[in-house]
Swiss-Prot record:
Its EC number is 3.6.4.-. Residues 1-182 are annotated as: Large ATPase domain (RuvB-L). Residues 183-253 are annotated as: Small ATPAse domain (RuvB-S). Has 3 domains, the large (RuvB-L) and small ATPase (RuvB-S) domains and the C-terminal head (RuvB-H) domain. The head domain binds DNA, while the ATPase domains jointly bind ATP, ADP or are empty depending on the state of the subunit in the translocation cycle. During a single DNA translocation step the structure of each domain remains the same, but their relative positions change. InterPro entries: AAA+_ATPase, AAA_lid_4, DNA_helicase_Holl-junc_RuvB, P-loop_NTPase, RuvB-like_N, RuvB_C, WH-like_DNA-bd_sf, WH_DNA-bd_sf. Residues 256-341 are annotated as: Head domain (RuvB-H). The gene is ruvB. The lineage of its organism: Bacteria, Pseudomonadati, Pseudomonadota, Alphaproteobacteria, Rhodobacterales. This is Holliday junction branch migration complex subunit RuvB.
């Protein structure tokens, strides 16, 4: 095994599309209490006014429920839902085809909106502000601009890289909403609900064990639940207990903090090859044979949230918690006393 277990990666996999396990309303949705409370107000206000809800931007690490919240918004607004992604919208005509087919007050969800091409983004501006499309017809001296009126709609954008959004695009979202990692208690509720939906008997200690190792991410919690249920059915009596959960997750390479082989390789690399850092992100990515984006978007957010690493102007450094977790003695060289003393 040379790379991290995809079970613990927060990117969407085909099995994550099981809609039966997804909450269907804000009432069912667990976690993100502040975001849910605000969305409930904005949704109710839009319904009372009979207008499209303001454009909304969800940002934060992957797997926290951006797509699910967008679908719930459309359902509670009582309107249609269309879904696409930034890389799919390669040219203005792709976006125009979607926008011109929206019904009044529909929700259009664009995942990975930070990956929109500049030419498509330019077409999106008047659509967001004036509900109109300005398209250039023809070429050269004969070219002319044609304005097409659109039905009022709500754009919901989702991004894991808020800093990559251009300022003009970011400023056109009236409701920017950051999604946070989930608490262990919240994930426990999600796992227990998932087990019930799957028709699996579970012990509180069993669901808690999965929640503890799910990296604060519901998508990962759902994946781990499915794998533990597999072990419970094949190697147990079908009941999700703490013992079967611990055995299954340990065999999957998931430790008690939720770190997998990829995370431990990252920490081990900095500890053993670079004395705990600082070391540049490009060096880390090259040594792990990963892209810089993969390291910054997939591996580092949870390590930062857990206080295992530090980002400094000179590069990444291990925090004392990382040394302790890996069972490695930190170096006693110059400059280490403040961090590890």
């Amino acid at each position: 095994m040379t790379s991290s277990d995809p079970t613990l990666r927060p990117e969407r996999l085909p099995e994550d599309m099981d809609r039966a396990l997804r909450p269907q309303s804000l009432e069912e949705f667990v976690g993100q209490a502040e975001a849910r409370a605000n969305l409930r107000v904005f949704i109710e206000s839009a319904r009372m006014r009979g207008e499209a809800m303001d454009h909304t931007l969800f940002h934060g690490p992957p797997g926290l429920g951006k797509t699910t919240l967008a679908q719930i918004m459309a359902r509670e607004l009582g309107v249609g839902f269309r879904m696409t992604s930034g890389p799919v919208l390669a040219k203005p005509g792709d976006l125009a085809a979607i926008l011109t087919n929206l019904e009044p007050r529909d929700v259009l969800f664009i995942d990975e909106i930070h990956r929109l091409s500049p030419v498509v983004e330019e077409v999106l501006y008047p659509a967001l502000e004036d509900f109109a499309l300005d398209l250039v017809i023809g070429e050269g001296p004969a070219a002319r601009t044609v304005r097409i009126d659109l039905q009022p709609f709500t754009l919901v954008g989702a991004t894991t890289r808020l800093g990559l959004l251009t300022t003009p695009l970011r400023d056109r979202f009236g409701i920017p909403t950051r999604l946070q990692f989930y608490t262990e208690d919240e994930l426990d509720l999600i796992v227990a609900r998932g087990a019930r939906m799957m028709g699996v008997d579970s012990d509180p200690e069993g669901t808690r064990e999965i929640a503890r190792r799910a990296r604060g991410t519901p998508r990962i919690a759902g994946r781990l639940l499915r794998r533990v249920v597999d072990f419970a059915l094949v190697e147990g009596d079908g009941r999700l207990t703490q013992a079967i959960a611990d055995r299954a997750l340990t065999r999957l390479g998931v430790d008690h903090l939720g770190l997998d082989l990829g995370d431990r390789r990252y920490i081990g690399l900095i500890a053993e090859n670079y004395g705990g850092g600082p070391v540049g992100i490009e060096t880390i990515a090259a040594a792990l044979s990963e892209s810089r984006d993969a390291v910054e978007e997939v591996i580092e957010p949870y390590l930062l949230q857990q206080g295992l690493i530090q980002r400094t102007p000179r590069g990444r450094m291990l925090a004392h918690k990382a040394w302790r977790h890996m069972g490695i003695e930190p170096p006693k060289g110059p400059g280490q006393s403040d961090l590890f003393g």
